[in-house]
Amino acid sequence: LEWLIYENKGLLMASKYDKIIEKVFFDNYSKTSKISFDREELALASKKLNIPRIKNLGDIVYSYRFRKDLPHTINETARTGCEWIIVGTGIGSYEFRLSQIAKIEPASNRQKIKIPDSTPEIVKMYAPANDEQALLTKVRYNRIIDLFMSMTCYSIQNHLRTTVNGIGQIEVDEIYLGINKNGIHFVFPCQAKSPGDKFGIVQVLQDISFCSSRYSSVICRPIAMQFLNDNSFAILETRIEEEDNILKLVVIDEKHYKLVNRDDLSHEEIKNYRKLSNDVT
């Protein structure tokens, strides 16, 4: 019974959020690719709709940025092949932006590259099997970012919450700094997802904005990672492209890795990796 009550409250709140965000969108709508609004408009919309004021107005925007799609009535106004997203433009200010429809997920036909597992046994014993924190931990201990980017990389911060001018509050799962053989410096903002989740453009946009603000002198290369199962995961390098004011999330590179015990990696497999490397070069 308690579960049903909780579920009904969640559905009711979702319905309120849909009505409020629809009101704000259509009150400002014009046939452009950018529509600005602020937090006070959310409060005004709830008042006009006779909806008791939501205590945490920011959760309305957060829901549509990271947890759910905007109502279909809003996306029906988008150009063919596009959808509306919400991006932060400052503290308490936002924009609806047109973006190509692109919820990215790992490819299903990639070779899994076996890597000897360097995760400490005590960490394996106590770390959860496949949540985002466990993924970040295994990637860090096995220096997967170094392998993927072919350079030396260092984790400097994880689960960072901060405020960026022109964006507002953001959270970055983990940040790596890297240096290549030519001495060029890079910053890699990482986002981790649990199995079944998809990568969206909003998170990548805010990661890039954060790095441009804090690490303006280095090259930013966003990374997405996701468990495929307990010991296999996908690593993707992403990029944002923009044409005619329409945003697009693209994948630059993708590799799948599998952590194994040393007995599970044969000499024949190692020879095959070498052959594949020679074929590529």
Model-identified regions with their sequence ranges:
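Positively charged, polyanion-binding regions of nucleic-acid-associated proteins
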Residues: 8-39, 45-49
